[in-house]
């Protein structure tokens, strides 16, 4: 009798799991997928023990993103910055840090807003240290590394987009996307948190959980997502506070190295969010540059989604006007 009951219970559980699996697939969920981007584009990143990943030195050639597009080059210098059109290392430096919008993903080397600014500046060397996928915390870690290897940096500009707040805390949703894009070199992610006194806490890189059969079962893939979501939930609630502490640390490190620091907003924000940042920046004596990328089809790369060369050009003009040292003799 006990064996019969156990068998019945076992088959009931199997049937229930099977029905859940079918239900998930019908409603659009599926097994874990990792897309092999190496089939269609060069791999531009390599693993980094502390940063998670870093740009791969050399020139990377991309096919057109659409029938209307063109071949583009993404060239990474020996110092891991992107080419901006000037090799004069004797000049004082203005450096930009941030994610893919700052880096200029999907446009050519000389079509990024940093390159457009460089073309107008003969006095300063403009260095673009933006890295695709980076948030504020990775940019902070990179900034520390930059200061260890560079002198004569007069100005540091952090190019912010709202999604950086999600990246800073290794939110479950972002970890899922990084896993999907992992063939681009995104494997592990360092993240930030804060303690009870709102002090910034630095956490070592982590990776997405890959359970057995997650690439075969929608149910197991869903369980992976839930686990990552639960693990990051408390940090996500504090993501704005964490973002502020990261920015404060960027400003502090810049000042300690005799550099000015500016906070650059590259995406339109709701008024409430802008006001919160303005209050924070004023309180901490940090300068704001508000130059969001323009919207509209002509301002994004077709079939890719990142800002186009025209979008970068327009934004570069806005940024140039806001950098006082570029507008003085």
State where each predicted segment sits.
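Serine-dependent acyl-ester chemistry module
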Residues: 161-281, 286, 291-301
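Helix-to-loop transition at the C-terminal end of transmembrane segments
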Residues: 23-34, 168-169
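Histidine-centered active-site loop/cap adjacent to the catalytic His
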Residues: 6-8, 303-329
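Hydrophobic membrane-insertion alpha-helices, especially the h-region
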Residues: 8-23
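Conserved SGNH/GDSL esterase-like catalytic core that processes O-acyl groups on lipids
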Residues: 93-95, 103-181, 192
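Short, amphipathic alpha-helical "lid/cap" segments that border enzyme active or binding sites
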Residues: 136, 140, 240, 244, ...
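Membrane/wall-proximal cationic-aromatic binding patches
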Residues: 29-120, 294-299, 329
């Amino acid at each position: 009798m006990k064996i019969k009951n156990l068998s019945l219970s076992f088959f009931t559980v199997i049937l229930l799991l099977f029905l859940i699996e079918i239900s998930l697939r019908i409603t659009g969920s599926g097994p874990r997928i990792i897309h092999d981007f190496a089939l269609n584009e060069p791999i531009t990143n390599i693993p980094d023990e502390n940063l998670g990943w870093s740009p791969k030195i050399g020139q990377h050639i991309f096919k057109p993103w659409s029938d209307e597009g063109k071949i583009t080059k993404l060239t990474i210098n020996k110092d891991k910055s992107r080419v901006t059109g000037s090799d004069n290392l004797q000049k004082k430096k203005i450096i930009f840090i941030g994610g893919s919008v700052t880096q200029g993903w999907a446009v050519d080397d000389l079509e990024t807003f940093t390159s457009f600014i460089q073309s107008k500046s003969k006095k300063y060397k403009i260095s673009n240290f933006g890295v695709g996928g980076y948030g504020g915390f990775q940019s902070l870690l990179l900034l520390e590394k930059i200061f260890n290897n560079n002198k004569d940096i007069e100005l540091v500009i952090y190019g912010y987009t709202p999604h950086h707040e999600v990246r800073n805390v290794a939110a479950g949703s972002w970890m899922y996307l990084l896993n999907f894009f992992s063939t681009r070199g995104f494997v592990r992610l360092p993240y930030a948190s804060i303690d009870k006194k709102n002090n910034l806490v630095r956490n070592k890189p982590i990776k997405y959980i890959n359970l057995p059969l997650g690439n075969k079962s929608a149910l197991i893939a869903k369980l992976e997502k839930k686990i990552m979501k639960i693990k990051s939930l408390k940090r996500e609630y504090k993501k704005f506070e964490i973002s502020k502490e990261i920015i404060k640390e960027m400003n502090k490190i810049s000042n300690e190295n005799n550099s000015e620091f500016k906070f650059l907003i590259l995406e339109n924000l709701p008024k409430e969010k802008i006001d919160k940042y303005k209050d924070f920046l004023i309180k901490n004596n940090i300068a704001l540059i508000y130059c969001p990328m323009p919207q509209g089809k002509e301002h994004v790369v077709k079939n890719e989604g990142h800002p186009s060369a025209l979008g970068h050009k327009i934004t570069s003009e806005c940024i140039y006007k806001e950098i006082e040292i570029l507008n003085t003799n």
